[in-house]
Amino acid sequence: AHQWFGDLVTAESSKHHWLQEGFATYYALLAEKELYGEDYFYSYLYEKAQQLKFASRTDTIPVLNAKASSLTFYEKGAWALFVLHQKIGDKAFKKAIKNYLKKHAFQTVNTNDFFVEIEKVAAFDTKLFSKVWLEDYKFNTLEANDLLKKNAAIKVQLELDQLRNTPLAEKKDFLMKVLQSDVYYTVKESVIFQLRKESYDDIKELLVLAMATKNWSIRQKIANLFPKVPEAFKADYETMLTDASYQTQEIALFQLWNSFEN
């Protein structure tokens, strides 16, 4: 991606560094979307949105600033492009990018040069967009979530997020439904995350469902769930010693050794 954004077209100053890193990150993600699918694509964007939202509590430097962090240049820059892509549509976005690269090939550019090409293909308020996504250090969670909800898996993920502080008894049926569904595996991992402070007896039905997914990543989350492996869970836990992931095997072996004398 840097062959186009960085090599073919280069930012004129560090203030506009997102034109390289944000663009390269987003286009690499678009390529991964073609390989791994939409659920992967939206799961990545969701994860980065959480990181950016958390970082904005202490990081007050926006995208259009030479001192912005790598997370801001790369990931918020990519997020800004995703928002723009969604707002003006795929056809207009691709046309603007193509025109931008052709017009400024082997030259230095600034953010306004890019916006000029956007305004040629779409009736879009680039000034407002810039204020919200490039000049404000805060992450626009409301707008981000509205776009993320277009993906069915992330819609469920956002519902799960709302239940983080809900007592287990009140959300258990929903958690079981998620684990039994064909929703993307990262959403099921979020279910495991919400079980970390619960007793084994209260969550054993959920663990049976999670283990049955046979997804190595979900099972690895279970391997790390307990400080000590419950005696009643030992037999099921031992099946992770033969999982496809060597890291899961390592975690399981250590946890079993740490939990049982023999």
Predicted regions and their residues:
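Short alpha-helix carrying the canonical HExxH Zn2+-binding catalytic motif
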Residues: 1, 5
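A donor-sugar binding/catalytic signature common to diverse glycosyltransferases
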Residues: 6, 11-12
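Active-site and adjacent substrate-binding regions of carbohydrate-active enzymes
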Residues: 8, 85-88, 96-100
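Acidic/His/Gly-enriched intrinsically disordered linker/tail segments
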Residues: 14-82, 86-87, 104, 121, ...
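Non-catalytic, well-ordered alpha-helical scaffold segments
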Residues: 21, 75-78, 82, 94, ...
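Stable alpha-helical elements in mature extracytoplasmic
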Residues: 23, 77-80, 89, 93-96, ...
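Beta/coil-rich, acidic/histidine-enriched accessory regions frequently appended to metallopeptidases
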Residues: 106-258
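Short, intrinsically disordered, charge-balanced linker/junction segments flanking boundaries
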Residues: 261-262
